[in-house]
């Protein structure tokens, strides 16, 4: 397995063990280190953008303007993220939900004493600790650290409301939510991170997503299923840190009738690191429909973080391949009659499909994430044809039973 990027990331983190105002920088910076997980060089433009945007930062003090006992946050203004955060409110009704991306920006003047002292501190750390990166990358890291020092100083001076007893975030391993997690821990408030993806071993390379486990700094993790607890225990986590809660968006889901017609498919494409694998699958689907007379209508759903220009060459009316707009969530499409099965590429949306009674086939060429699931993997055109025929002929009751076993273990322990 390729661990180059992960080793590079860990080496850098070992040089950033530095505490400022009671906050360990090694716990705050991982979410900003995507540059460690790529061969693409940091450019002068990246450095300029880092310093330019770093003058301003999110006013996290607005999160503290609440009379509720529980604060819930999510970082990125995406509908599915918001839906997950809002669904948690059912368990903690005395709560406020805030999208951090929508908050105001504040900052320190780049000519002020605070900014300059933080800039010098960042330079000293990066250039005196044998960081094994290019000069340009070091400057980029200085920009990140300067911004983090600014954020820490600004937030740390804000009084924590005594009424707040619990902080629940979308991902304590990432960016501003890491800072809020450490802030609340410093003020003896219980911190909880939501599970938003599957924790698993990797087969080919260690991606940036590893930070979700490595930097899980919240006191507790609200887990989807027993599979998460079993896996993280093997990685040294104490069982007392886990709350078995299920995926709150799918607690009402039931697996009833399983459609075995295989006529309308939602293709759940993988994130940016899996673009080559996505392309191979889309070419295969074109080949399938040309061979079988456009037998299946394929709706293509890009990962939200994949830019619009990717995969556009595969949109084809002639081959029955159509893209689904970003305004339509995966859950929305799966709960409709638009599709009767799915194909998944290295994505936990695989479980969303099963949870709603839709058969899901897993494209496993270049598979990197070792998900627990059904006997539904295929690697080529013949494999796709075989799996479709296999599930068409399999008794519906057996498919439903296997779906329930997977979902109860991974996604929804309360599934009936």
Language model features with spans:
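Catalytic-core helical/loop segments in enzymes performing group transfer/polymerization on anionic/lipid-linked
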Residues: 1-416
